[in-house]
């Protein structure tokens, strides 16, 4: 049945989502989570009819009765169809119990249940339940847990329908709510302009922290070891043009590491370049990291007060790296500044805010807060401490929040100056106490209605994380490229090039980019001279790219990190070998062709008929092997009777993944019981055929 979202219905009725949610709860007894929740289209039509005739009380009363009858009927139909039961309001508890009593053959179980508990609910002897499980090929002891699907199949044997317990259904609701939590409210009436979040990047000692220090009119630099930033700090600065939130990072590595975790919190990057030093290796890396993240760059040409300052030389070098200054006909804003004399600072802030204005940054301060973790740490006296950026909504002391896979209730909140505050709006950095564990930089946070909800959502997040780790997406590699890299409908191969001399870098970049075709786009994300470092691996991981090295090797730390992050590093001595490998990988990116490969044969020697399972074939493997995952053919007198899949494969009573030549096995075929002695079971699989370029 078609569904209607609450916010769509509220628009049709000319009411706010919140007002409609209250009406549904108070007048109809329908509980919905938020504006993204859905109800049946039939129910929506009835609600529209009732609200349009709200002046006629008698009519309204009749309609409510009719509506309640239809809801009751709907619930019964859903139960008959084994649709999972939704969370009910406490007021409907008695009504639910009466409905349960109407179904003698319906039981309610959780996502997992022990064999003993299932037998109790079915009111059957444990031995009978275990027997049915054995017929299904599941060997489970009395206290062993089985999943919902298996429980349903066992219950069906006893003519009992199974529905999932409300708590489990509620968890799925929570999961759905969690996934929708980042969607913005359709009603933009309460949205306001928010301050931009700016990250300051640049080469070491080019004056990043000094510049920010000058803007904030405070003294941070002196407190940090060696004058180099030791942590990720976030600061809000008030200017005449408005507020700006600055992230002072320990370099672009942190920026990219957070981007690799899906954290897109930076609106604008201020790239600091020393006027007397020009573009340096870390400056070049920072430029490439920003381009990979599609973040606009404002260049601050610092130290213009120094005798050796040469602004035009810096602009020339920027042009060589694709950043053409506005006064040279490009679109990159370049502002000469001096952190020491404070010259040009107002202009830098003005240009940054102007860049942000073009992006039309807005947020809704009235909604529940959400945002991103900048850093997390464990304080001996205060417990887990997290620095956050609020990206939407307003965060308040006492809010229950989920942060990544941890949760908690905010006990205290501090601003960037260490002052205790009670609330924080969009783009405001804060430090909070009250989490159950230390979150990681880049984790998303969300405010939820209570701590119980946060705890449940954290459990769901942990489950999802565990599942994602088990079936994690592999990083791109030359060996398996076609299924890994896609940019919309255009396939893309990202490459980071490192070489021993600059001439090799440029030659390799040009050669690789010429390999681009309509099917595959080759993009060199970053190219530089020197050994392959951890920074290269971090960028490759975040951009899902491969690293190609010419006459250079990865250092030990880079190799270890690449293995951990599953980043593919290839080193060569000859450029043509690399080009051939890239061509081969691009061929692999095209849709593969498959051929059939027979992996084994088995002869059916005995037939066993089991009422609850069907026909079990006792076989002897005559060649190759039979695997549980392979496709099979049943061949009788040289004629193929069936092509299908195995339902089970066993050695004695144990499930087997494969059975080799010379061994006996028992097997059943999915949806096929007409097996006869003397039949041949042929196992085969489809393998990819290497394509010619």
UniProtKB/Swiss-Prot annotation:
Entry keyword annotation includes S-adenosyl-L-methionine: no
Amino acids binding GTP: 202-209, 248-252, 302-305
Claim: Glycosyltransferase is one of the keywords in the record: no
Principal location class: cytoplasm
Compartment list: Cytoplasm
Gene3D superfamilies cross-referenced by the UniProt entry: 1.10.10.2480, P-loop containing nucleotide triphosphate hydrolases, Translation factors, Translation initiation factor IF- 2, domain 3
GO cellular component: cytosol
Keywords per UniProt: Cytoplasm, GTP-binding, Initiation factor, Nucleotide-binding, Protein biosynthesis
Start-end of Acidic residues biased regions: 92-102
G2 as annotated region, ranges: 227-231
Stretches the record annotates as G3: 248-251
Chain residue ranges for the region called Disordered: 78-102
A Gene Ontology molecular function term of the record: GTP binding
Domain tr-type G: 193-362
Location of the region described as G4 in the Swiss-Prot/TrEMBL record: 302-305
Annotated region described as G5, given as residue ranges: 338-340
InterPro entries reported in the protein's UniProt record: EF-G-like_DII (IPR053905), IF2_II (IPR044145), IF2_N (IPR006847), P-loop_NTPase (IPR027417), Small_GTP-bd (IPR005225), T_Tr_GTP-bd_dom (IPR000795), TF_IF2_bacterial-like (IPR000178), TIF_IF2 (IPR015760)
Region of interest (G1), ranges: 202-209
Pfam families reported in the protein's UniProt record: EF-G_D2, GTP_EFTU, IF-2, IF2_N
Role according to the record: One of the essential components for the initiation of protein synthesis. Protects formylmethionyl-tRNA from spontaneous hydrolysis and promotes its binding to the 30S ribosomal subunits. Also involved in the hydrolysis of GTP during the formation of the 70S ribosomal complex.
Family, similarity comment: Belongs to the TRAFAC class translation factor GTPase superfamily. Classic translation factor GTPase family. IF-2 subfamily.
PANTHER family, per database record: TR-TYPE G DOMAIN-CONTAINING PROTEIN (PTHR43381:SF5), TRANSLATION INITIATION FACTOR IF-2-RELATED (PTHR43381)
NCBIfam families: IF-2, small_GTP
Identification of the protein by name: Translation initiation factor IF-2
Species the sequence originates in: Clostridium acetobutylicum (strain ATCC 824 / DSM 792 / JCM 1419 / IAM 19013 / LMG 5710 / NBRC 13948 / NRRL B-527 / VKM B-1787 / 2291 / W)
Lineage of origin: Bacteria, Bacillati, Bacillota, Clostridia, Eubacteriales
């Amino acid at each position: 049945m078609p569904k209607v979202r609450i916010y769509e219905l509220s628009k049709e009725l000319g009411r706010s989502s919140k007002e409609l949610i209250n009406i549904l709860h108070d007048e109809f007894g329908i509980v919905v989570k938020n504006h993204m929740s859905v109800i049946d289209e039939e129910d929506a039509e009835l609600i529209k009819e009732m609200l349009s005739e709200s002046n006629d009380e008698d009519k309204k009363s009749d309609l409510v009765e009719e509506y309640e009858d239809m809801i009751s009927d709907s619930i019964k139909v859903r139960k008959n169809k084994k649709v999972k039961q939704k969370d009910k309001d406490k007021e409907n508890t008695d009504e639910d119990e009466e409905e349960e009593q109407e179904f003698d053959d319906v039981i309610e179980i959780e996502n997992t249940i022990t064999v003993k508990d299932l037998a109790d609910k079915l009111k059957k002897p444990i031995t009978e339940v275990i027997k049915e499980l054995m017929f299904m090929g599941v060997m489970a002891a009395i206290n062993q847990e089985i999943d919902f699907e298996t429980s349903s199949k066992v219950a069906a044997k006893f003519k009992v329908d199974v529905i999932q317990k409300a708590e489990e259904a509620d968890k799925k609701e929570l999961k759905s709510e969690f996934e929708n939590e980042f969607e913005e409210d359709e009603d933009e009436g309460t949205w306001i302009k928010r301050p931009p979040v700016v990250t300051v990047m640049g080469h070491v000692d080019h004056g990043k922290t000094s510049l920010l220090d000058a803007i904030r009119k405070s003294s941070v630099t002196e407190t940090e070891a060696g004058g180099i930033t030791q942590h990720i700090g976030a600061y809000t600065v008030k200017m005449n043009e408005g507020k700006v939130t600055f992230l002072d990072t320990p370099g672009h590595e942190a920026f990219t590491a957070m981007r690799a975790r899906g954290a897109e919190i930076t609106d604008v990057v201020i790239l600091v370049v020393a006027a007397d030093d020009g573009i340096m290796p870390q400056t070049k890396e920072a430029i490439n990291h920003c381009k990979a993240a599609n973040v606009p760059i404002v260049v601050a040409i610092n130290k213009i007060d120094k005798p050796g300052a040469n602004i035009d030389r810096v602009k020339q070098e920027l042009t060589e790296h694709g950043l053409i200054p506005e006064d040279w006909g490009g679109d990159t804003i370049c502002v000469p500044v001096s952190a020491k004399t404070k010259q040009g600072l107002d202009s830098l802030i003005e240009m940054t805010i102007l860049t942000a204005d073009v992006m039309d940054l807005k947020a809704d301060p009235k909604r529940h807060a959400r945002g991103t973790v900048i850093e997390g740490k464990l304080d001996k006296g205060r417990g887990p401490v997290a620095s956050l950026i609020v990206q939407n909504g307003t965060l308040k002391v006492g809010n229950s929040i989920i942060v990544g896979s941890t949760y908690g209730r905010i006990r205290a909140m501090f601003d960037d100056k260490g002052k205790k505050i009670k609330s924080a709006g969009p783009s405001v950095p804060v430090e909070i106490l009250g989490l159950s564990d230390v979150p990681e930089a880049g984790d998303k946070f969300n405010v939820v209605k209570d701590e119980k909800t946060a705890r449940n959502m954290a459990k769901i997040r942990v489950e999802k994380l565990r599942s994602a780790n088990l079936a994690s997406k592999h990083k791109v590699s030359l060996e398996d490229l076609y299924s890994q890299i896609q940019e919309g409908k255009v396939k893309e191969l990202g490459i980071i090039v490192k070489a021993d001399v600059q001439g090799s870098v440029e030659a390799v970049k040009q050669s690789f980019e010429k390999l681009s075709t309509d099917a595959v786009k080759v993009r060199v994300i970053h190219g530089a001279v020197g050994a392959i470092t951890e920074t290269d691996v971090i960028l490759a991981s975040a951009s899902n790219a491969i690293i190609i090295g010419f006459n250079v090797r990865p250092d030990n730390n880079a190799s270890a990190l690449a293995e951990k992050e599953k980043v593919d590093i290839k080193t060569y001595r000859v450029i043509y070998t690399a080009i051939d490998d890239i061509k081969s990988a691009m061929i692999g990116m095209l849709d593969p062709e498959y051929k059939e490969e027979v992996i084994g044969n088995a002869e059916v020697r005995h037939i066993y008929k089991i009422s609850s399972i069907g026909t079990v074939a006792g076989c002897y493997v005559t060649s190759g092997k039979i695997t549980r995952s392979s496709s099979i053919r049943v061949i009788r007198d040289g004629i193929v009777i069936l092509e299908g899949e195995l339902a089970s494969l066993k050695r004695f009573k144990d499930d087997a993944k494969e059975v080799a030549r010379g061994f006996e096995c028992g097997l059943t075929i999915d949806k096929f019981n007409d097996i006869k002695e003397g039949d041949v079971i042929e196992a085969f699989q489809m393998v990819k055929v290497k394509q010619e370029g």
